[in-house]
Amino acid sequence: MARIFLTGGSGFVGSHVLPALLAAGHQVVALVRNEKAAERLRVRHAAAPGALETRLGDVVDAASLRGAVDGCDAIVHLVALPRDWNGGADLERVNAGGTANLVAAAQAAGIRRFVHLGALGVLERDGLHYASSKARGEATVRASGLDWTILKPSLIWGERDGFFNIVAALVRVPAPIVPVPGDGKSRFQPVWVGDVARAVVQVLGDPKSAGRSYELGGPRYWTHREITEEVARALGKRRLVLPMPVPLIRLVAGLSEAVRFPFPVATDQLRQLAFDNIGAVDGVERELGFVPVDMGGRLGYLRRKISKQ
């Protein structure tokens, strides 16, 4: 099997992709930023001795990548920053710049195979720093001349996720109302993190996937309002979901950013939530040959996390 260089192996998606790669018989070289993260990975995957190696580095440090990728057959790039408090500069540095650094390292090392985790619906839009930075990262991969494959998921759900835990935090607030930006009708296609990991392993082993992008979404669409209601049900909370004007929520979020108060959602994310984030409802089954898991009734992990606090 192949020797895979993996970024983001200690993150939410990576914590599912890494064991999936090991289970498929691959050797994994995981990029980590410090020795503490390396030790956590080694302990977590102690049952696979010899199959996991860690190397220190950072995607924003081009020099650290040059030797780190040596000896690998393929690269799986998962690292992405979802938001920042720096006007988009950090998003650009990680999502666009970090991807460019890794592509350059692959080219220099002669590594042809490159699987990149993009995002569904990202375009270069004025004021949408996350979407623009991810779009520029994807453009770099497409223009690389490598045997690339891009996976573009909608919202990803699963234990340790970002978005659904943020919604859960809002639902946990002891108030009868949970605000959603705009009219609450923006549509999403939540996809289970286990299905994302399955897709990574599948395309990695399929030469025909080179030069292609795949949209990853669940088997049905959910509005923002429906997602919030589903989270409330999972937590056993009775809440009224109240649409609120985006400018009002952006004002509150903007004030929190100005004083560095950790408001759950950055203003950039609020703008992004105004757009639909969906692909073909049968896209995964048609393109990858498996039926993705439906999110409905499966958010119990949010309650379990609360019970540990």
Identify what each model region corresponds to.
Residues 4-26:
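N-terminal Rossmann NAD(P)H-binding glycine-rich loop of SDR-like oxidoreductase domains
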Residues 31-36, 58-59:
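N-terminal Rossmann-fold cofactor-binding loop
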Residues 46-101, 105, 120-124:
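NAD(P)H-binding glycine-rich loop region in Rossmannoid oxidoreductase-like domains
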Residues 60, 122, 156-158, 196:
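Conserved sequence/active-site signature of Rossmann-fold short-chain dehydrogenase/reductase
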Residues 81, 89-144, 149-151:
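Conserved Rossmann-fold NAD(P)-dependent oxidoreductase catalytic core, especially the SDR/UDP-sugar
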Residues 126-128, 149-168, 187, 222:
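Flexible, glycine-rich beta-alpha linker
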Residues 169-191, 195, 199-203, 207-210, ...:
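A conserved pocket-lining segment of Rossmann-fold NAD(P)-dependent short-chain dehydrogenase/reductase
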Residues 202-265, 279-309:
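Mid/C-terminal beta-alpha module of Rossmann-like enzyme folds, strongest
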